[in-house]
Amino acid sequence: MEAHTPSAALVPVIDGVVGFRLVHNFGAAWGSFSGMVVVLVIVSIVFCAIILAYMIYVAKEASVLETVGLALIFAGGLGNMIDRLSRGYVVDFVEPLFIDFPNFNIADAGITCGIICVLIAFLIKFFAASKHVEHSE
């Protein structure tokens, strides 16, 4: 079984930049863990539960950026998990044409944007805390 099974012709959206092509992804990112649907669903459930618990019980003082990032990661993980449970694979359809990069979907984009938001929020907190320590000395 291939990790990525293209099942449609390319539909250009922005010529030379991005197009749509239906791909059945039986794995995770870049087709890793292909055919391990049960493992991927379990990992998705665990990560979604951890993020949800963190948002409810720990992140009460979280910034808007951190909250948005965690929500995007949670929603993306949930979306991909629903695909895996209902179809046995994730539906990927966005195909970058300007670089050699695997097809992805909106859930993947949400996860990526969410990780970036959380990292930026962490860096803002880190540098704000280090400035606070610097000024208090």
Residue ranges with predicted function:
Residues 1-137:
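Alpha-helical transmembrane bundles and membrane-interface segments of multipass inner-membrane proteins
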